[in-house]
């Protein structure tokens, strides 16, 4: 068994440590309507196509009940579309500030390429959003071989179509010769649905939801507890492996290749 390609997520995995770019915007568009949502609630659907993310938030029982209390009805599709349009407008303005590669990512990518491994990517951002992020990330030294957005396929995560399109464009098959790595539950489901080795990265992830400064300053026992919660969440949602930092990825690959593991 030889791994021939790795498909990376973007925000929270390779760029934007902690996946903070969309978080504040999701909270803001609800707050403007008098409906407060928590950071934990805002993060829960992370990884989905962003309009699906807005829709998922409106379907959470607490948020739906609060909306109904204020407006006398549940959120409509018109409400969802209006909030999404506001989300896009605000996000486009701030995205360039959230495209810096996470520490260690560029070095890992360089090492993978030295081994002849192809680098693909999927995202919950639209093509228009990714035009901004990918351009800025490239200026800072990170550019995968291929990028697929939900706009390029019939549906985004948790459907496997973005991974399949990467496989076709990169010329790699079968799917168990590829790894999908990401930082959200929807990433884990996407990878498993595509029949790929699926890896969850914890530090810098949306699921952990901490900035680099918070990680550095947190009590080690408290941080360890939070890391293990995220690790378990990834495993419960299909991860074959979890890693704390991207630097551990190659050791996972070696385990797969040397032990001739089989996807279950």
UniProtKB/Swiss-Prot annotation:
Its cofactor is Mg(2+). CDD domains: HAD_PHN. It catalyses: phosphonoacetaldehyde + H2O = acetaldehyde + phosphate + H(+). Mg(2+) binds at residues 9, 11, 183. One of its GO terms (biological process) is DNA repair. The active site is at 9 (nucleophile), 50 (schiff-base intermediate with substrate). It is an enzyme of class 3 (hydrolase). Gene3D superfamilies: HAD superfamily/HAD-like, Putative phosphatase, domain 2. Keywords: Hydrolase, Magnesium, Metal-binding, Schiff base. GO terms for molecular function: magnesium ion binding; phosphoglycolate phosphatase activity; phosphonoacetaldehyde hydrolase activity. It comes from the Bacteria. GO terms for cellular component: cytosol. The keyword Hydrolase applies. Binds 1 Mg(2+) ion per subunit. Its EC number is 3.11.1.1. It holds the Pfam family Hydrolase. InterPro entries: HAD-like_hydrolase_sf, HAD-like_sf, HAD-SF_hydro_IA, HAD_sf, PGP-like_dom2, Phosphonoacetald_hydro. Involved in phosphonate degradation. Homodimer. HAMAP family: PhnX. Belongs to the HAD-like hydrolase superfamily. PhnX family. This is Phosphonoacetaldehyde hydrolase. The gene is phnX.
């Amino acid at each position: 068994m030889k791994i021939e390609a790795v498909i990376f997520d973007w925000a929270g995995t390779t760029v934007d440590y902690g996946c903070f770019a969309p978080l504040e915007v999701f909270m803001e568009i609800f707050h403007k309507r008098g409906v407060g949502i928590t950071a934990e609630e805002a993060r829960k659907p992370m990884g989905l196509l962003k309009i699906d993310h807005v829709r998922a938030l409106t379907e959470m029982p607490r948020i739906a009940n609060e909306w109904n209390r204020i407006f006398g009805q549940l959120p409509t599709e018109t409400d969802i579309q209006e909030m999404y349009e506001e989300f896009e407008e605000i996000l486009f303005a701030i995205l360039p500030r959230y495209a810096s590669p996470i520490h260690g990512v560029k070095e890992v990518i360089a090492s993978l390429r030295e081994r002849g491994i192809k680098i693909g990517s999927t995202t919950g951002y639209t093509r228009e959003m990714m035009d901004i992020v990918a351009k800025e990330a490239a200026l800072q030294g990170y550019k995968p071989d291929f990028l697929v957005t939900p706009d390029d396929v019939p549906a985004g995560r948790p459907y496997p179509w973005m991974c399949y399109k990467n496989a076709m464009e990169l010329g790699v098959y079968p799917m168990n010769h590829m790894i999908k790595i990401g930082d959200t539950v929807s990433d884990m489901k996407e990878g498993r649905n595509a029949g790929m080795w699926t890896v969850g990265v914890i530090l810098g992830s949306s699921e952990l939801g901490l900035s680099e400064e918070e990680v550095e300053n947190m009590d080690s026992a408290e941080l360890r507890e939070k890391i293990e919660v995220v690790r378990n969440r990834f495993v419960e949602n299909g991860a074959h492996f979890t890693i704390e930092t991207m630097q551990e990825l190659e050791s996972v690959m070696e385990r797969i290749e040397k032990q001739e593991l089989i996807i279950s």
